[in-house]
Amino acid sequence: MTIILKDLSNSSILWEGFEDEFGNYSGTPPTEDYDYSPCEISTETLNKYAVVVIDALVFLLSLLGNSLVMLVILYSRIGRSVTDVYLLNLAMADLLFAMTLPIWTASKAKGWVFGTPLCKVVSLLKEVNFYSGILLLACISMDRYLAIVHATRTLTQKWHWVKFICLGIWALSVILALPIFIFREAYQPPYSDLVCYEDLGANTTKWRMIMRVLPQTFGFLLPLLVMLFCYGFTLRTLFSAQMGHKHRAMRVIFAVVLVFLLCWLPYNLVLIADTLMRAHVIAETCQRRNDIGRALDATEILGFLHSCLNPLIYVFIGQKFRHGLLKIMAIHGLISKEFLAKDGRPSFVGSSSGNTSTTL
């Protein structure tokens, strides 16, 4: 399917076959200064049926996996660490987002048929999931940096501080996502079905730039720099001091951070490229807009996939998580105590900070 841009009276634009963009902004009208010469813009996206199958699998895995993670952490009161509290909140964010996946999937297949209120709510949950995820991981990186590099008992060891920090992260995530919540609505573009989109009137381009740059700066780039700084020095300390026991205890945390970056970094890099194109920092052409639009579609699916991956990390890398899950199953008679004994009791590794070991 294509969109034909024509030089009509008053530079109006005829949009034919405008498809549901699903919140990633590709295929929107070009900026006001664009040269409106005839231009054929492809809106062909990934196979809808394949996307529906992937979303359905992600939904089921995320629903089951994150529920089990929350169960294991909440059940393991003894030995629960500050990091576990952060990971518990991370699982909550992924679970909340997973609950919206069926709605997003249906909108890909049939357009947005759920009205403006639900459009605002699911868009808010999607943004809050991303921002809370990277902010929680940034807090974990700072806690590990202080505990290992400086060998200090951090303020976050005081449980009331941990609660306030987590509440602050959720509040900041909502604030960063608030513009999307305010301006998203069920919108009817010309020659298209309803979409869940932000319609900002004549100043759409300018406001969309602001809505992108500020959250990307404070909700992605700055936390990413904090994580790179903290984990860079943490890794250097672990390897230079040959602290193998702490290195093993950090494997799960490093894996969680790595998977988050692999899933969400591509989408945000493409989004930055799209923003630069709309700001005329890089030239806007039909081909470039097509390429960025397809890249946004593909990388967004990768970002959605992240919501079901953390539980898999805990299962394959986190020995304590596996043992905690088997222990719960044994208590409820789902497996024998002999089978639990064969799994063995993982040793909890201590540290100078007192909280390097985690339930996972």
From Swiss-Prot:
Extracellular side: 1-48, 106-120, 184-208, 274-294
SUPFAM superfamilies in the cross-refs: Family A G protein-coupled receptor-like (SSF81321)
Annotated disulfide bonds: 119-196
Chief location category: membrane
UniProt-listed Pfam families: 7tm_1
Sites where a glycan is attached: 10, 24
Posttranslational modification: Phosphorylated upon ligand binding; which is required for desensitization.
Transmembrane intervals: 49-75, 85-105, 121-142, 164-183, 209-231, 252-273, 295-315
Family: Belongs to the G-protein coupled receptor 1 family.
Molecular function per GO: C-C chemokine binding; C-C chemokine receptor activity; C-X-C chemokine receptor activity; interleukin-8 binding
Keyword presence, 4Fe-4S: no
Localization terms from the record: Cell membrane
Listed name of the protein: C-X-C chemokine receptor type 2
Topological domains annotated Cytoplasmic: 76-84, 143-163, 232-251, 316-360
Taxonomic superkingdom: Eukaryota
Keywords, comma-separated and alphabetical: Cell membrane, Chemotaxis, Disulfide bond, G-protein coupled receptor, Glycoprotein, Membrane, Phosphoprotein, Receptor, Transducer, Transmembrane, Transmembrane helix
Organism: Bos taurus
Membrane topology annotation: Multi-pass membrane protein
GO biological process, one term: calcium-mediated signaling
PANTHER family per UniProt: C-X-C CHEMOKINE RECEPTOR TYPE 2, CELL ADHESION MOLECULE
A GO CC annotation given for this chain: external side of plasma membrane
